[in-house]
Amino acid sequence: MKEYFSVKMRASLQGRHVSGAERIVLKEDLPTVISQLSQRPKEYDSLNIKVEKINDLNYIEKSLNVKTINVKDWIEGNKVAVEILQNQGVDKKIAEKYINLIHQGAVNGENMRGAMIVNLSGERVEKDKTRGIRTVNIDFEDRKAITELLKEKGYTERTVDALALATKTLNHPDIVAEYCISDDPSYTTGYVATKTTYYRINPLKQLSNEKGGRIYFVKDTANIEDIYQYLESEAFLIKQLGDLQ
């Protein structure tokens, strides 16, 4: 019987998070993956790798479809993002309010550590507004093949990771859409995910902006405890890649 393990890497520099990654791999692949993840961060003074056996593994048949939208600047990119969110039932003013919050950062000037959860009435409903919520315990069953397919189409390792996270997130019945920008000041591509599609929007934030984060838009009737259990505790592998548009 196959034994799967979760491998999580977190690196920080002077107390600031600089790199993170996660894999779900077979036991025999642990040495290789641990070595790869330890070499991923460029500069750090603290590196932590956590390995845990997975006893209950679930599967998602296919990832979200991928569509790239190139725009002239980040302002236009966010107009496109808001339109996509509106098509999922998110009110325009609510979408704009929380997108602006992501671009400006938390009240203390720092990035939000996890995702915000915002219901369709515009209320933030995550249990801890400082910590937020994280989607973890997700990977592709054949990550190598999926990565090669995406790279052939001009995508990067970032896309592999983000697509896996978004696919798990939007697989929950109460989550209707996601908005995400990186906190890397040099990386301006972001995305909006819906039930069917991962919209990669370039650019979605201003160059040199160090702010970043995620918003999960959920139904007003969403069971928040169930969302936390699903996103943070349940493990999934994705079997196939969706359509590349």
Curated annotation (Swiss-Prot):
Q: Name one Pfam family in it.
A: BioW
Q: In which pathway does it act?
A: Metabolic intermediate metabolism; pimeloyl-CoA biosynthesis; pimeloyl-CoA from pimelate: step 1/1
Top EC class of this enzyme: ligase
- One MF term in GO for this entry? 6-carboxyhexanoate-CoA ligase activity
Q: Which residues form a coiled coil?
A: none
What EC number(s) does its UniProt record assign? 6.2.1.14
Q: Which cofactor does it need?
A: Mg(2+)
Gene Ontology BP terms: biotin biosynthetic process
Record flagged with keyword RNA-binding? no
Q: Which UniProt keywords apply?
A: ATP-binding, Biotin biosynthesis, Ligase, Magnesium, Nucleotide-binding
Q: Which reaction does it catalyse?
A: heptanedioate + ATP + CoA = 6-carboxyhexanoyl-CoA + AMP + diphosphate
Q: Which InterPro entries match?
A: BioW (IPR005499)
> Which domain of life, per UniProt?
Bacteria
| Described function | Catalyzes the transformation of pimelate into pimeloyl-CoA with concomitant hydrolysis of ATP to AMP.
Q: Quaternary structure per UniProt? A: Homodimer.
The similarity comment for this entry is: Belongs to the BioW family.
Give the protein's recorded name: 6-carboxyhexanoate--CoA ligase
Highest lineage ranks of the organism?
Answer: Bacteria, Pseudomonadati, Aquificota, Aquificia, Aquificales
